């Protein structure tokens, strides 16, 4: 998982360089994470960059995201996001709705490239 987060960090660096060409220096890249563990991992990768604003979608005490329902506030936050970092692997059942609503949003799934164990 740490390798995925590091890869996501490299992706954010690339996005930062690309967005710097398009945006003014006062604008920041907005990164949203799906839940608190992803937020902490992203925070550790991003560090103290003044070019990236990091937000978390769900409350820190939110448990399992399998049954999480997006709120209007969540959709508003995602509408301003450049990047959405999620766990993937089916944890975020709302992910297809987000991808459909915001086709230009870059979605990074931390489980990409990992062979997941089938629990059945």
Where does each model-flagged region fall?
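Extracytoplasmic metal-acquisition and chelation regions
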Residues: 1-120
């Amino acid at each position: 998982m740490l390798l995925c987060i590091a890869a996501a960090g490299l992706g954010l660096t690339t996005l930062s360089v690309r967005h710097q060409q398009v945006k003014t220096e006062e604008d920041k890249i907005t990164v949203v994470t799906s839940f608190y563990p992803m937020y902490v991992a992203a925070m550790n990768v991003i560090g103290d960059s003044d070019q990236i604003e990091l937000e978390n979608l769900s409350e820190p005490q939110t448990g399992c995201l399998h049954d999480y329902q997006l709120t209007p506030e969540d959709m508003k936050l995602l509408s301003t996001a450049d990047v959405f970092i999620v766990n993937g692997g089916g944890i975020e059942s709302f992910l297809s709705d987000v991808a459909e609503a915001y086709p230009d949003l870059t979605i990074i799934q931390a489980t990409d490239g990992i062979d997941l164990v089938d629990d059945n």
